[in-house]
């Protein structure tokens, strides 16, 4: 079957930005002008095509990366609309991994905002060529050139305006195309009646100045163009287009466009620029991977190459599990068997679909360069490679950040227990940043994610999609107890109730153990003062007491106990009596050994613009944190600190507030350390009050 579009005429692009810059509205207009939809859907009305989840339509934000196919000027354009909220970073991350080009949308009023920097860094990580659409030029305070300056200064981008707005705020009437040296005036509200004309006289000199700057910038991308520019003093429209495209593909040049998606101005020119300047799959370097023998290999984007694809998203669907794939090489046929080389298993392809948000078109095959979805994959998850069985390869996978916040979830009824289990498995399959674990001590189910909004949305989905009723609480910190000195302990259990009595007597020496040893027991009973059959029960009594602690009910760790003496009764002694005596001796010993409470310390790394460094360090200190290192590179500060886990709840929200959303942090367990006396007293008293 022939390709509907040659590979050179395919564009896989993402639309990414800070929350509220107008990404989804821009996508909606692209679909309207390219004929996918015949009525414009607005985000604030809850009618956007790409916002297909109930939560997205209610909140007016995009949570999941919706994939849509459309066409423009005889080119196939596959678009992914990504979320701008920092809690959904994984959605942006997975989009960047499978795209060839990005339209970064900036607000003409807000300019370079926090999440824009995060998205820009993600695009840098995967070397994705990009262009910028400065949106919302109709808003009060809109300033195209101010945003241009911020992109150059804050993102260190080699940005070049290829358009200028005619008017701004309420007077935005058209756009100057500096490449074609023409003006486009919008004659109706829908943006479908556009008049091409000469540049307005009052803007002619400004446009000429910016066009000259553009020529100079573009000429620097190519030696041949430099010669042409020096020889003729200018470049033709075709030379400019060629130079801009070369500059974008070499990741050096970022063309700037402007308009207002909401007011239907400038979107068709954005589509023209996607076709003219963003890369086709054949323009980007071949995907890299590893062969079974460990050798590195590449797969060029070509239908005749062996089949390889990356699963970049898994989604529960009324018709079954949808696995989104980016085709890198070869052809994938409906009904075929493929290998998941990441897990070394075979999978069957039941059906193939191309998506238009929540609408879908079934196809018989997907080809190199396509974005599509597969039904029928049972064990494939995000980041897995699918390939031909004859020539396996494992492609570079996704960078998946560690979750930073966790809460406990408790089903309200027994009936909810099973539903909760199914919901958690399904949600964890879809979202690799969502983790589920069981706290062995509290027996609570703990869910972890990228932020409070992330977990809020997931809990909301449990309720709506899986009909689970659950109580959501704050997670409990897993404290520990230990001892700081040595002493003796003694326990004597003697009971006489009529007939046979109970008797057990144990004497122990107790001392701090080596870090990481937990509970260590040594038997030094000599001369049969305690028969062998009672040693084990005595040790078990101590171990059980160790597990439930003495101070505040937390496990006692790193303690060495030596049983040195004791006594027994021929008739009344029993295993139970010695188990109780062992426990009594252990409690007696701990009280004399300076017991202390330990808390989990976390290694925390915060990355933030330099301006916020003082606030970050002050806040970490107020959380009982110890700053262990800091560095500044290119205006970005990094702070390494050790902070008690108990003080880190709510930190994601606090950091966002302190840094206007521009700070990011990672956190992992480091070790246990002693809790300061005043804090320990409060914890002990609270726990003793609860018991």
Swiss-Prot record:
Localisation: Cytoplasm
GO BP annotations, alphabetical order: ribosome disassembly
Domain tr-type G, chain residue ranges per copy: 8-282
Molecular functions (GO terms): GTP binding; GTPase activity; translation elongation factor activity
PROSITE patterns: G_TR_1, G_TR_2
Key words, A-Z: Cytoplasm, Elongation factor, GTP-binding, Nucleotide-binding, Protein biosynthesis
Domain of life from the UniProt record: Bacteria
Signal peptide limits: none
GO cellular component, one term: cytoplasm
Broad class of where this protein is predominantly found: cytoplasm
Binding residue positions for GTP: 17-24, 81-85, 135-138
Family from the record: Belongs to the TRAFAC class translation factor GTPase superfamily. Classic translation factor GTPase family. EF-G/EF-2 subfamily.
Matches recorded under PANTHER family: RIBOSOME-RELEASING FACTOR 2, MITOCHONDRIAL, TRANSLATION ELONGATION FACTOR G-RELATED
Chain's role: Catalyzes the GTP-dependent ribosomal translocation step during translation elongation. During this step, the ribosome changes from the pre-translocational (PRE) to the post-translocational (POST) state as the newly formed A-site-bound peptidyl-tRNA and P-site-bound deacylated tRNA move to the P and E sites, respectively. Catalyzes the coordinated movement of the two tRNA molecules, the mRNA and conformational changes in the ribosome.
Name of the protein in its database record: Elongation factor G
Species this protein is from: Prochlorococcus marinus (strain MIT 9211)
